[in-house]
Amino acid sequence: MNAEIIAVGTELLLGQIANTNAQFLSEKLASIGINVYYHTVVGDNNKRLQQAIEVAEERADMLIFTGGLGPTKDDLTKETIASSLEEKLVYDENALALISNYFKRTGREFTENNKKQALVLNGGTVFANDHGMAPGMGLNKNGKVYILLPGPPKEMKPMYVSYVEPFLRNFTTGENIYSRVLRFFGIGESQLEVKVQDLIDGQTNPTIAPLANDGEVTLRLTAKHQNVHEAEKLIQHVEDLILERVGEFFYGYDQEFLHYKAIELLKKKGLTLACAESLTGGLFGNQVTENAGVSSVFKGGVICYHNDVKQHVLHVPEEVLSTDGAVSKECARYLAENVRELLKADIGISFTGVAGPDASEHKEPGTVFVGLAIKDEPTVVFPLNLSGSRQQIRERSAKYGFYHLYKKLEEI
């Protein structure tokens, strides 16, 4: 079954709010085997909404609407759909009682426009709104399924989970969709694709979808099957083939981001970390502290943006700063080693470089050095040549820091 999501609201077209409902619904629908091929956004206008309905009916089996169920004049979703389907709107007694009781409790006047929220499509299934006023509804007519949901995510999401998904399962084959995301770093999207292109071209179940994002690449493996264990077998087989070829760049699954994986490995090894940040200006330390319980492994950091701090706090020799420069392999080495000693940590990591937009010390933007000093191990400095905006270079430098930290920890 194919679905189209139609988000109703002029505020969406104006960019005043993001259409997060479509993302949520697409993911949920995919998990129960309903394909979403189109997202449509239309303003609070009867004529344009009617046009959107007519177009969607030509290309989808299921039309899912969000928004436009409220009490105001521009909330016209159910009125437009009722007119299109030649169905009556009737009051749902449970919803009407809920709304009436709310106004009684709050001592406010129960006006006719608020009463409007209890109107539902005649003959449809009503979805209770446990977090708001306007109920949702579902109707199967003329070979199409129509689903109407409230716009506020705090109302729509729990309504979908509790009432809508069980209703939708009546229209599915029972074949569910299962996905697993493989995360890679240190290899470009085009390079990775070349290595697994035959697998991408030859697979239909599971499918393989690459995506590049901020210096890393993901592969989403998606399988369809009625049985979750069989779907996992399909995915595992393809995953094994992929990792045979590019396993050296693999670091995690799904939402296991680099900073999470690195910190979890630090905890597992029982090692502590300190950072010296010039180029990144605290970005690395900020991401470290996004992990719960990180105080057990993170000693702290020094933002050594000015050369005075590099020299007098982290004891980078003046001759290194004057000869090699602050953006150099030698400076990165001193920063990593000395912040480790200063904060009495097992590992010190440092970042120095040129974020741009202008060159510095006759070095081009994107010139970066990441130093890694591990107790009882030789210090390693990783030179990087990054591209992008000033912010992208800083963010990617921090990611490379987590990546090299993670890889070194795997070796210990």
Curated annotation (Swiss-Prot):
Per the record, the coiled-coil ranges are none
What Pfam families does its record include? CinA, CinA_KH, MoCF_biosynth
InterPro entries listed in its UniProt record: CinA, CinA-like_C, CinA_C, CinA_KH, Competence-induced_CinA, MoaB/Mog-like_dom_sf, MoaB/Mog_dom
Position of the signal peptide: none
Task: Fetch the Gene3D superfamilies from UniProt.
Answer: 3.30.70.2860, CinA-like, MoaB/Mog-like domain
What family does the database annotate? Belongs to the CinA family.
Which PANTHER family would you find in this protein's record? NICOTINAMIDE-NUCLEOTIDE AMIDOHYDROLASE PNCC, NMN AMIDOHYDROLASE-LIKE PROTEIN YFAY
Record protein name field: Putative competence-damage inducible protein
The organism is Bacillus cereus (strain Q1)
